[in-house]
A protein has these predicted regions:
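Residue-level recognition of tetratricopeptide repeat
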Residues: 60, 94, 159, 193, ...
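Short coil/linker segments at helix-helix boundaries
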Residues: 107-148
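Hydrophobic/aromatic packing residues within the alpha-helices of TPR/SEL1-like helical repeat arrays
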Residues: 43-50, 84, 142, 149, ...
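Conserved structural position within tetratricopeptide repeats
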Residues: 52-55, 86-89, 147-154, 184-188, ...
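Conserved alpha-helical positions within TPR/SEL1-like repeat arrays
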Residues: 65-72, 96-107, 161-171, 183, ...
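Terminal, low-structured helical/coil segments at or just beyond the last alpha-helical repeat
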Residues: 206, 210-240
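Register position in tetratricopeptide repeats
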Residues: 73, 107-111, 138, 172, ...
Length: 240
């Protein structure tokens, strides 16, 4: 199978995101679902720099945010969550603080649960439903992370990534219909959101709606996620 020929997608842009990045004023700051490519030594150096700034004067929420980010990236999750909470106390109406605290809380759960191997991510598999079923044995809860995203959505209802992140956590918690709704909302806000199409497709396969799931995976492939075509091939082979 080959990706269909489609017009270039219009980039998803929100002025509020740009304004936030400008307010922080950090060249390293970016909105991304990928792993950071900043060297560990650089992260440690930046973290020490933020500590010095915080000790030298009254804490600014912007510096607290920056330190919370570096703490998260060096896997000091508890300290990171605490630092985000301090930033939120100073700026409780900023949705990006809740978004990042949610992400850190989820990463902390993922890290802890990976130690006892009782947790599985949604990923490409011959039977994605089996992956989700494995989560029933997991005792960890994403409730606090979801609560942060509820707050972020309330403060910034046009932010597709908040719905997408919440959908991921709902899916991993086994709330597939609710996850489907959030993926759909994210797609309505950002029609070129390839990852949302992909994950919604997987969710629909898990809910046994193979036709609509296949359509979403095909769309994800058109938008650049070539792995979606591999999932389609696997399901086609299972049906034959």
């Amino acid at each position: 199978m080959r990706p269909d020929s489609v017009p270039a997608a219009k980039p998803y842009h929100l002025q509020r995101v740009d304004d936030f990045k400008k307010r922080i004023g950090n060249e390293y700051l970016t909105l991304s679902c990928r792993e950071s490519n900043i060297a560990p030594d650089t992260l440690v150096m930046l973290d020490k720099q933020y500590v010095q700034e915080l000790n030298a004067s009254n804490p600014a929420w912007t510096v607290l945010f920056e330190r919370a980010v570096t703490q998260s990236l060096i896997k000091q999750y508890t300290n990171s969550v605490s630092t985000y909470s301090s930033a939120i106390e100073l700026n409780p109406s900023n949705p990006f603080l809740y978004l990042n605290r949610s992400t850190t809380r989820a990463e902390m759960i993922d890290f802890i649960s990976s130690i006892d191997n009782s947790y599985q991510r949604i990923t490409i598999d011959s039977d994605p439903a089996n992956r989700l079923n494995n989560n029933s044995k997991r005792t960890y809860s994403y409730d606090e992370a979801v609560a942060d995203l509820n707050k972020a959505v309330k403060l910034f209802p046009d932010f597709a990534y908040a719905y997408y992140n919440r959908a991921n956590l709902l899916a991993l918690s086994g709330s597939l219909p609710e996850a489907f709704e959030d993926y759909t909302k994210a797609i309505s806000l950002n029609p070129a959101f390839a990852e949302a199409y992909y994950n919604r497709g997987i969710i629909q396969l898990c809910m046994k709606d193979t036709r609509k799931g296949g359509l979403d995976l095909s769309k994800a492939g058109e938008l650049g996620i070539t792995e979606a075509y591999e999932v389609l091939k696997r399901y086609a082979s299972l049906d034959n």
